Amino acid sequence: MAKKKSTGPQPSLSSSPNGRAKVTAETITTTTTTTTDTTNSYSLLNIWVISLALKILLFIGYHSTDFDVHRNWLAITNKLPISQWYIENTSQWTLDYPPFFAYFEYLLSLLVPRFVANDGCLDIVEIGQYGLPTIYFQRLTVIISELVLFYALQTIVKTSPTLSAKRRMYVATASLALSPGLILIDHIHFQYNGMMYGILLLCINSARLQQYLSCGFWFSVLLCFKHIYLYLAPAVFIFLLRGYCLKFYWNKRKNFFINIFNFIQWINLFKLGSIVILVFIIAFGPFYNVLPQLISRLFPFSRGLTHAYWAPNIWAVYSFLDRILIQIYKKIPMSKYPLLKIFQFDPNSLNNDQLLKTSTRGIVGDIEFFILPNITPKLTFLLTLFYQIMALIPLFIQPTYRRFVGALTLCGYASFLFGWHVHEKAILLVIFPMTLLVARDQKLLTPFNLLVSCGYGSLFPLIFTCNEWLIKVVYTYTWYIIFYFNFRKVVRPSKNNIIGNGIGNGNGKGGGIILDRMVNLYILLFNVVVIITSLFDLFKHKYPVLQNFEFLNLMIYSVYCAIGIISSWNGFCWLYFIDDGIWNQDQ
């Protein structure tokens, strides 16, 4: 029989005394070099350097009042004893983040150079007066704090088990490292979300590695930095409880009560509980004497249902529908009787034009609707809780990493879509965990594309200055185009095709081809929304009549993006509850 011709470098073998082949050092060196090269090719360092250049260029750009918020917190934590941090109210920008973030601000205040302090950076005043030194310093702290995010992203790639998994995770983590949401919110608007989402990703990666104690630790730390992540807490709680603290095993030789007692792994529960409690003691212990004031700062319940700019959720559509019904009632006489009969509202309230202009714009205080029933905090809480519980049931039955990230995503969806006084920036709670899943199956691409296009697009009104318009639009569109194609290169093909599954397949094949095209058309039409609203902003100062419709462009953004995000939620829910193949634990 003829020997097969070698087509590449073969391992070098030498004979050992016992007659067995032995791999030489040359082979080991070659293998090690190949592995090292593969690992280095998935480094995020070059992406960090590229993004760093852009972020530095944004130093002198627009910043929101959040900049002065954090400047005031630097001053409070630097100049006052810890007992007064949550009491001081010289400025309206009072400290209203959990203690770990206050400690973080204190550490930053210790790094303030003298010339920056002399610029007004550490002055406790009602209205801050500062110049470029303060701006440069605070901008730089955001970049430095974001190293936590890049460390977490690189850790996710590094700990991926196979080369194909590394490749998929590299695309996913690169998309998060270059996220338009972080550019707009952190590096223009001004916040520290990058660091916080880095901690969240460390928690998620610990769950993937089945490091349950580490997962609980990181999430506890995260809650002590920013309490908005309480929205994700149910998924983390169920995952740790079911995966680490409960063991369903029935011993027929033992009685009922002993078996029930043995369901709980008490040692694991004690270890996990000790870590969580210790983190919260370290965070809140020094504020024991001012806990009531601290809690009232963290959870102010006097705010309205919607924010000044309606977050693109269910309540944006609800508010829009109320405005439409008001116009129908006023313009179409035949509609008055059926509307009064169905909704039982006071028609005299529609005569107050001043109230009509302000009632549903999300101004702090109680929000009233004129025709539709008013929404209470209790109702929003119950709706959020209901949809979160629905997501937690499959996680409790199947406490795997994939189910965990899916449940995190749905908990983020539920809180964003149904929560009380939701900020548009909270859409990142949904985007970040879902990004880690999207390359898992091509069917996830359709809801993901809807989510990121409408989610990131809904952030555009945050940056309303002309100088930054080109940056926010061009950067976001460039990001979307790059990762639209890159995700398609690495996404895993669907193992099964559910015809009529309520969403597309992500590749325009099978039963979802029509819905895929509808989604793509919807995303393309968002360009029209951007153009119309931009022209409105451009000409409203030239034509005074347009100033009567000041809220119109914000409403267009909110409602259009809300429809897309709600649709992406519906598609993701279908896959989460129906398509079990996506959630299997194979690599």
From Swiss-Prot:
EC number: 2.4.1.265
Pathway assigned to this chain's UniProt record: Protein modification; protein glycosylation
InterPro entries to which the protein is assigned, alphabetical: Glyco_trans_ALG6/ALG8 (IPR004856)
Intrachain disulfide bonds: none
Membrane side Cytoplasmic: residue ranges: 63-139, 193-220, 296-298, 400-415, 465-466, 540-557
Domain of life: Eukaryota
Lumenal side of membrane: 1-41, 161-169, 242-274, 322-378, 437-443, 488-518, 579-587
Record field: compositional bias (Polar residues): 7-18
Record carries keyword Transferase: yes
Membrane topology: Multi-pass membrane protein
TM region(s), chain numbering: 42-62, 140-160, 170-192, 221-241, 275-295, 299-321, 379-399, 416-436, 444-464, 467-487, 519-539, 558-578
Signal peptide: none
Enzyme class: transferase
Ranges for region Disordered: 1-30
Function summary: Dolichyl pyrophosphate Glc1Man9GlcNAc2 alpha-1,3-glucosyltransferase that operates in the biosynthetic pathway of dolichol-linked oligosaccharides, the glycan precursors employed in protein asparagine (N)-glycosylation. The assembly of dolichol-linked oligosaccharides begins on the cytosolic side of the endoplasmic reticulum membrane and finishes in its lumen. The sequential addition of sugars to dolichol pyrophosphate produces dolichol-linked oligosaccharides containing fourteen sugars, including two GlcNAcs, nine mannoses and three glucoses.
Family listed: Belongs to the ALG6/ALG8 glucosyltransferase family.
The protein's name: Dolichyl pyrophosphate Glc1Man9GlcNAc2 alpha-1,3-glucosyltransferase
